């Protein structure tokens, strides 16, 4: 900052010497009046910059007013150029360059705000030639597309009828700003970015939106600009989730992904999908009477001499089995007899596997009955065969050789 101040002071002193020694002739007042811009440098009228950017008045000699003090008085009649055009043009261009430097760095003690820097760096003449600066995604600048669902580009127009009043809000939605002009002339750089439909609607003399007292939303986005028809949003959608439902209505509306909540208005969101009642099948209830009846019929068919009562009585008082009885059960003669009875075992096993509780009851009853039958020597041979058959049922219909060897 100190180096810039020293350089500007030196240039200012050199400009004063050049201005005092310059011998300029009479000059036409029309060509050098305080117009909107001088040459193509992008310098605009000082009063407009002061009005728009609210910059305080600087002393004479640091602004463009020193240029008019340097120039001599103007003849009232038709003036003619008496001085050399080349030297005068070079003097004027050097004055303009030095004045622009002093004007930008004169208030360097208090740095200008962000708005002033941005507005001074973009002029009307240069803005029309080059593309406007658009910030990319970073921590400070966020693109508009990320938050379009919540804030969007919608601007509530005022009912005064002047469309220029809505421009600052629109500039905020585009994340860039232009110098706010005191007059109602549209900035050319902003006009160049907008589609043709929006600019033609701006310059039209009679607009239907200006006469309506209620404010209507103006849809503003990078893809397309459309004025929605005035009908209220649907009651099922909240304004936070669906900013403008009308933006997607019509042929030229914006394309929106199907996962957005505005596309799912017909469906109920947040409600659990329950299965229909037809799919629930009642589980079969356990019929204990039928199970006991099956048990009695099974015992009567397998061993005709032993009924269900005898089986339960023998289960109540089981005598301890001796080693000789176990050896007699495990003899190969009994195994040979068991092979003869195996086709009937399959039939009874199929009946047993239908009910798990019946299997458990049969298992408990089978534990007691063979012990009593093998313990009595006076019983006939078929009682021992029946008891061996029940031992086979206890093993699941197949002979477990490892269990026999272990016994």
From Swiss-Prot:
Residues making up the signal peptide according to the UniProt record: none
A Pfam family reported for this protein in Swiss-Prot or TrEMBL: FAM53
Motif placement: Nuclear localization signal: 272-275
Annotated GO biological process: positive regulation of canonical Wnt signaling pathway; protein import into nucleus; regulation of canonical Wnt signaling pathway; Wnt signaling pathway
Subcellular location: Nucleus
Biased composition (Acidic residues): 357-369
Superkingdom of the source species: Eukaryota
GO CC entries: nucleus
Keywords: Nucleus, Wnt signaling pathway
Tissue and organ distribution: Predominantly expressed in proliferating cells throughout embryonic development.
Biased composition annotated in UniProt, kind: Basic and acidic residues: 264-281, 327-339
InterPro entries documented for this protein: FAM53
Stretches the record annotates as Disordered: 204-286, 306-380
Keyword presence, Nucleus: yes
Primary location group: nucleus
Effect of inactivating the gene: Delayed epiboly and reduced embryonic size.
Disulfide bonds: none
Subunit structure: Interacts with ctnnb1.
Family the entry assigns: Belongs to the FAM53 family.
Cited function: Acts as a regulator of Wnt signaling pathway by regulating beta-catenin (ctnnb1) nuclear localization.
Protein name in UniProt: Protein FAM53B
Native source species: Oryzias latipes
Gene (UniProt): fam53b
């Amino acid at each position: 900052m100190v180096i810039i101040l020293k350089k500007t002071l030196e240039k200012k002193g050199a400009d004063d010497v050049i201005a005092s020694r310059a011998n300029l002739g009479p000059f036409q007042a029309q060509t050098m009046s305080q117009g909107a811009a001088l040459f193509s440098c992008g310098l605009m009228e000082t009063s407009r910059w002061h009005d728009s950017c609210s910059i305080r008045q600087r002393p004479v000699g640091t602004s463009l007013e020193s240029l008019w003090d340097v120039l001599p008085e103007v003849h009232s009649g038709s003036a003619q150029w008496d001085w050399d055009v080349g030297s005068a043009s070079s003097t004027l261009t050097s004055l303009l360059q030095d004045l622009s430097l002093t004007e930008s760095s004169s208030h360097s003690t208090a740095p200008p705000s962000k708005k002033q820097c941005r507005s001074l760096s973009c002029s009307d003449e240069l803005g029309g030639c080059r593309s406007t600066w658009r910030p990319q995604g970073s921590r400070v600048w966020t693109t508009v597309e990320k938050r379009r669902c919540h804030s969007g580009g919608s601007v509530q127009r005022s009912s005064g009828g002047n469309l220029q009043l809505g421009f600052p809000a629109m500039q905020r939605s585009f994340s860039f700003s232009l110098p706010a002009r005191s007059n109602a002339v549209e900035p050319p750089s902003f006009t160049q970015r907008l589609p043709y439909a929006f600019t033609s609607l701006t310059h039209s003399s009679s607009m239907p939106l200006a006469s309506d007292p209620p404010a209507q939303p103006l849809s503003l986005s990078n893809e397309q600009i459309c004025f929605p028809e005035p009908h209220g949003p649907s009651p099922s959608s909240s304004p936070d989730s669906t900013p403008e439902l009308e933006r997607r209505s019509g042929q030229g509306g914006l394309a929106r992904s199907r996962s957005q909540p505005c596309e799912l208005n017909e469906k109920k969101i947040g409600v659990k999908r329950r299965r229909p009642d037809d799919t629930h099948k009642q589980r079969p209830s356990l019929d204990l009477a039928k199970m006991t009846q099956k048990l009695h019929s099974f015992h009567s068919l397998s061993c005709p001499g032993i009924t269900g009562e005898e089986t339960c009585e023998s289960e109540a008082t089981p005598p301890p089995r001796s080693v000789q009885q176990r050896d007699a059960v495990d003899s190969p003669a009994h195994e040979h007899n068991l092979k003869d009875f195996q086709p009937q075992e399959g039939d009874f096993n199929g009946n047993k596997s239908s009910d798990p509780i019946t299997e458990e009851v049969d298992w408990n009853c089978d534990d007691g009955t063979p012990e009593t039958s093998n313990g009595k020597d006076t019983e006939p041979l078929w009682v021992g065969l029946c008891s061996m058959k029940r031992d086979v049922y206890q093993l699941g219909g197949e002979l477990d050789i490892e269990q026999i060897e272990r016994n």
